[in-house]
Swiss-Prot record:
PANTHER family: DNA-DIRECTED RNA POLYMERASE SUBUNIT BETA' N-TERMINAL SECTION. Its cofactor is Zn(2+). Its main location: plastid. It comes from Chlamydomonas reinhardtii. The gene is rpoC1A. It is found in: Plastid, Chloroplast. DNA-dependent RNA polymerase catalyzes the transcription of DNA into RNA using the four ribonucleoside triphosphates as substrates. It is an enzyme of class 2 (transferase). This is DNA-directed RNA polymerase subunit beta' N-terminal section. Zn(2+) binds at C283, C285, C329, C332.
């Protein structure tokens, strides 16, 4: 249909059958629709739920805003005495009069009658192809939706887009495009106005005044943290300031109720001023809520409601806090409210000194005990005042802590020896040195570069039984490395640094012109030699030269470890002049010192 012919028919109030949207049409694209409840104010969003549109064209002039150019209507009546007041109204009133729609001005929204369902049938005309019947509600408010449309030419209402192409060519309904232009993210609902006619079904977008249950950016939770409340935050939760200036919330009395009246004591653990009334809307004086005996105060309430949608802001992005009045008694300062708030209302006790939190004392791990380096048992005793700790004793534990690396290593040695005795206390380990050479073995002074020298071709068997392996020692290897090699079964260079700094204190010095046994010690770490070496006759033979012409065979009668003051171990070897060289039998059931004295006397 040409737009000029459409404009002429529109002025005459002709109904168009190709318009599939049941609406009340103003020229220039203004649509009226039914609204349940009071009409919205100008400037707010006028879209509401349960819309009831009427399929009828109310024709008027294209210049509807100008009351000077108002032509006569053919099918409808506009009984308006004051056209200026008509144009300034925010809604129109529709009633059913003789199968025609009559538009009249409404007074107040409160004067609306109840809903009465009715039916309107459109009589056939030259341009109407079929009979269309639909239901509507009489005596309802039909408000103008606030749809911002650009002004179009008078002869082309709602048919041309910005490019000049008709909306019908694009497959769009021009009246349906009005609702598509409305900005709303709410789900749409469909309402049918006829049971048999499917054409009368229109999808209308619904406004939700509450937060949606579906996903939205506003209700998205990115992070949840759980912290301990600080003292100021606890005081903020528990305190409340009355209109007369009193601050209530601190528990200052340890008592609960009075033994005679059985009422809560003021400022106690059951105080009504702090936690709330015992009975609903009744103070401690026994007075019930009355407008004459209360104090009011406006405080922030936790209820949050969304602000209505507006065209300038995005929907559901602003929140408004409702202000609620709270009423208090003038005499006893008890709030007039429900007694159930005693379950949630907080109070606080002001402590003279800070105390520990049970999570950090009894928790696993106990962070305070780790920080103070105390046992949890002693920490709980101090926390619950069953034990005392003075400053003098508190710093005593610090003196026992190792400071230097050597002391740390020594303490570690002791701990590992107790924890793993089978690893650090070797058993059935024997050292046997054989040699056929008669080169002398000398003990040098501690200040010399070479500590010990020994005869070549010395073999040290390692292990037991068939697993014994012999290690040939080089001539340049010092004797202390031999001892370490035999004890630890490791290369001497790897662990040499462990005992090097203490080695000079353990050298044995032989007195001149003395026939007593020599005590030769080596700085050896970790491993203890067994004491069964002498009992099993596993002897270590050394050849020592003297001023005589023949060598004297000496034996190591006893080998043992002695713990020094600094935590290191000494390998003490008692070198005894053997009586075997003179043909005498060596006693076997005596300890090392007895043998030493006996052999010394024999010599």
């Amino acid at each position: 249909m040409h737009y000029k012919k459409y404009a002429e028919l529109l002025k005459n109030g002709t109904y168009f059958s190709h318009i599939h949207s049941p609406t009340l049409l103003y020229p220039k694209g203004k649509v009226m629709y039914a609204q349940y409840g009071n009409s919205p104010l100008q400037g707010l969003n006028s879209q509401v739920t349960n819309l009831n549109l009427i399929r009828k064209v109310v024709a008027a002039s294209a210049e509807m805003d100008s009351f000077k150019k108002l032509p006569n209507l053919q099918n409808n009546k506009l009984p308006l005495n004051n056209l200026k007041a008509r144009l300034n109204t925010k809604a129109i009133y529709i009633s059913n009069e003789e199968a025609q729609l009559t538009v009249s001005k409404i007074g107040t929204p409160n004067a609306i009658e109840t809903d009465v369902p009715g039916t309107i049938k459109n009589a056939p005309s030259n341009t109407l192809l079929t009979h269309r019947s639909f239901k509507f509600f009489v005596n309802k408010i039909y408000a103008k939706p606030l749809i911002s449309l650009k002004k179009t030419k008078e002869t082309k209402p709602l048919l041309l887009g910005k490019t000049g192409t008709t909306l019908t060519q694009k497959g769009l309904n021009p009246f349906q495009s009005l609702f598509l232009n409305t900005k709303s993210s709410s789900p749409s609902t469909a309402r049918s106005f006829g049971t048999k006619n499917i054409v009368n079904t229109l999808q209308i977008k619904k406004i939700v005044h509450k937060f949606e249950n579906s996903y939205s950016k506003l209700t998205e939770i990115n992070l949840i943290t759980i912290n301990l409340a600080s003292a100021n935050r606890i005081r903020q939760w528990a305190e409340k300031t009355l209109p007369n200036g009193k601050v209530v919330g601190e528990v200052i009395n340890p008592e609960t109720i009075h033994y005679k009246t059985l009422k809560p004591i003021k400022g106690g653990l059951f105080c009504e001023r702090i936690f709330g009334p015992l009975k609903d809307h009744e103070c401690a004086c026994g007075k019930k809520f009355n407008i004459k005996n209360y104090l009011t105060k406006t405080v922030n309430n936790s209820s949050i409601q969304p602000i209505a949608e507006s065209r300038q802001t995005q929907p559901n992005t602003q929140l408004s806090l409702n202000l609620q009045k709270r009423y208090f008694c003038r005499i006893c300062d008890v709030e007039y409210t429900y007694s159930i708030i005693r379950r949630t209302q907080l109070g606080y006790i002001q402590l003279a000194s800070p105390t520990t939190h049970v999570w950090f004392v009894k928790g696993i791990p106990s962070y305070i005990s780790i920080l103070l380096d105390m046992k949890k048992k002693h920490l709980q005793g101090i926390t619950y005042n069953t034990e005392t700790l003075t400053l003098e004793n508190s710093f005593r534990g610090r003196q026992l802590l190792p400071v230097s690396p050597s002391s740390i290593f020594e303490s570690w040695q002791k701990i590992m020896k107790k924890q793993y005795p089978e690893k650090y206390n070797l058993t059935n380990t024997m050292i046997k040195i054989k040699s056929t050479n008669t080169l002398p073995l000398r003990v040098s002074q501690p200040n010399s570069n070479t500590s010990y020298s020994y005869m070549p071709n010395i073999y040290i068997p390692e292990g037991e039984g068939e697993e014994k392996t012999k290690t040939k020692l080089k001539k340049t290897t010092p004797l202390n490395a031999i001892a370490q090699k035999g004890v630890k079964y490791k290369k001497p260079k790897t662990k040499k640094a462990l005992y090097k700094q203490y080695l000079k204190n353990y050298y044995a010095r032989k007195p001149k012109n003395s026939n007593q046994a020599e005590a030769v010690s080596f700085g050896v770490n970790k491993v203890q030699l067994p004491l069964t070496a002498f009992q099993q006759r596993n002897k270590v033979y050394f050849y020592k030269s003297e001023k005589r012409n023949w060598p004297v065979l000496t034996t190591v009668a006893k080998m043992q470890y002695i713990v020094s003051k600094k935590g290191w171990f000494k390998l003490i070897q008692y070198v005894i002049k053997s009586a075997e060289s003179y043909g005498a039998a060596t006693p076997t059931k005596m300890d090392g010192l007895q043998k030493m004295s006996l052999l010394t006397k024999q010599a």
